[in-house]
Amino acid sequence: MAKNIQAIRGMKDYLPGETAIWQRIEGTLKNVLGSYGYSEIRLPIVEQTPLFKRAIGEVTDVVEKEMYTFEDRNGDSLTLRPEGTAGCVRAGIEHGLLYNQEQRLWYIGPMFRHERPQKGRYRQFHQLGAEVFGLQGPDIDAELIMLTARWWRALGISEHVSLELNSIGSLEARANYRDALVAFLEQHQETLDEDCKRRMYTNPLRVLDSKNPDVQALLNDAPALGDYLDDDSREHFAGLCKLLDAAGIAYTVNQRLVRGLDYYNRTVFEWVTNSLGSQGTVCAGGRYDGLVEQLGGRATPAVGFAMGLERLVLLVQAVNPEFIASPVVDIYLVAAGAQTQSAAMTLAERLRDEMPGVKLMTNHGGGNFKKQFARADKWDARIALVLGESEVADGTVVVKDLRSGEQTAVAQDSVAAHLRTLLG
């Protein structure tokens, strides 16, 4: 017997019971995006490696440790996308979507990072991201945060997520802070772990979100990023906070909040949860006004976010399981008798025409009534339609409520109206 081939470690199959949950959640997210006027863009999974090195930064963990990079048969270095913003910016430049224009875009799909697989984190994972180009005020930053807050309300998880905000200022202000932070860390190297010592000179702001408790205690005495902000960044951040206050969106200013990718400036934010064990980030983003120019386009203000769908699905399942309790099948059509199968399929097609969106499954493969009702139970159907030879002859169908056990014979011409009443 040939050896079974298994899925690659960290790359998960999503089976039918799971995909129904994902579709329900994704549908909710997409509806909210549409209500704000955002348009979908579909991007390649594979990009040229220099795109990510230039966008993300060569001394980030993503580029140094986590990217899936390979040479194709032409000798070109290609990478499975580890995130979506760089590809979205590349597409915007390539197709002339950005300069002197306003764009509100969203995308969804798999991303790839060679990380240690754990609950809610895989090597192939799925992100939904939104990017806005051509707007530089704090009002669009606020709109993106309001959009995400509307998601949480629609999914019933608002009480289980909290918003953290920060401003990391302009590139110049951050460079000044970087020098002050490095000088401080150099005086306390004995407290730093090896990872922080490495980051101290390559990407020192990443030391701020170290999970090491000794390092976190040390950082209480470190220079504060907020003290180094330029006046424009202070004004921008104050404007954002004022808009969120007016909208009733609670937040915490976390001066240690930085993002792991080099392209961010000014606003950064994260929605975090404590409802999945240790604190985890559900959605994160910020402003990246220099990235379009960095990738070869003309200077264009930009802001966006990305959300990991695996973690979001886990959170909805944990705190609001009723949201995803949707049956696979609403109606199961039971047909018994040599002459009934054709009539059953004709009736099923007519009901699908008359009741768009109904989940109706027709029995196939024969079987007596007992076996067919067992199949209806397996699919957790709410209603069974029973069509025997006598029903075919007199143009009726038996409608049975599988929850209450009540049943009634209904003319086939009026069964759709009867079913709408039962299904609500």
Curated annotation (Swiss-Prot):
E.C. no: 6.1.1.21
MF (Gene Ontology): ATP binding; histidine-tRNA ligase activity
Subcellular location: Cytoplasm
Annotated S-S bridges: none
Enzyme class: ligase
SUPFAM superfamilies, A to Z: Class II aaRS ABD-related, Class II aaRS and biotin synthetases
Catalytic reaction(s) noted: tRNA(His) + L-histidine + ATP = L-histidyl-tRNA(His) + AMP + diphosphate + H(+)
Predominant subcellular localization, coarse grouping: cytoplasm
Domain of life: Bacteria
GO CC annotation, single: cytoplasm
InterPro entries listed in its UniProt record: aa-tRNA-synth_II, aa-tRNA-synth_II/BPL/LPL, Anticodon-bd, Anticodon-bd_dom_sf, His-tRNA-ligase, HisRS-like_core, HisRS/HisZ, HisRS_anticodon
Keyword annotations: Aminoacyl-tRNA synthetase, ATP-binding, Cytoplasm, Ligase, Nucleotide-binding, Protein biosynthesis
GO annotation, biological process: histidyl-tRNA aminoacylation
PANTHER family reported for this sequence: HISTIDINE--TRNA LIGASE, MITOCHONDRIAL-RELATED, HISTIDYL-TRNA SYNTHETASE
Quaternary organization: Homodimer.
Family: Belongs to the class-II aminoacyl-tRNA synthetase family.
Protein name: Histidine--tRNA ligase
Species the sequence originates in: Salmonella gallinarum (strain 287/91 / NCTC 13346)
